[in-house]
């Protein structure tokens, strides 16, 4: 016979999968219209010129171009804004 007592059960051992948020296209990268730039919860990064925002706060490019991030001050807070500038062909 096996000489092992029954082990207790644990209430741990679960973990949810990550939601893959974050910056998807960085400053200086070329993007196409519709490309996702940032996936976020709330407005960590604000939309700038030629950037749209989806209803889940996803930022996306409205035109083909180059990504540029910018810090700016509003009400004594430093915020981040992302722009897409038209690429010179």
Swiss-Prot record:
<dbReference type="InterPro" id="IPR001684">
    <property type="entry name" value="Ribosomal_bL27"/>
</dbReference>
<comment type="similarity">
    <text>Belongs to the bacterial ribosomal protein bL27 family.</text>
</comment>
<dbReference type="GO" id="GO:0003735">
    <property type="term" value="F:structural constituent of ribosome"/>
</dbReference>
<keyword id="KW-0689">Ribosomal protein</keyword>
<dbReference type="GO" id="GO:0022625">
    <property type="term" value="C:cytosolic large ribosomal subunit"/>
</dbReference>
<keyword id="KW-0687">Ribonucleoprotein</keyword>
<dbReference type="GO" id="GO:0006412">
    <property type="term" value="P:translation"/>
</dbReference>
<protein>
    <recommendedName>
        <fullName>Large ribosomal subunit protein bL27</fullName>
    </recommendedName>
</protein>
<feature type="region of interest" description="Disordered">
    <location>
        <begin position="1"/>
        <end position="26"/>
    </location>
</feature>
<dbReference type="Pfam" id="PF01016">
    <property type="entry name" value="Ribosomal_L27"/>
</dbReference>
């Amino acid at each position: 016979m096996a000489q092992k007592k029954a082990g207790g059960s644990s209430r741990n051992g679960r973990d949810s999968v990550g939601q893959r948020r974050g910056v998807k296209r960085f400053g200086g990268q070329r993007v196409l219209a519709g490309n996702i730039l940032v996936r976020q919860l709330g407005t960590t990064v604000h939309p700038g010129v030629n950037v749209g925002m989806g209803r889940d706060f996803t930022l996306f490019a409205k035109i083909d171009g180059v990504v540029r991030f910018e810090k700016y001050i509003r009400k004594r807070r430093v915020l981040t804004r992302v722009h897409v500038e038209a690429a010179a062909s």
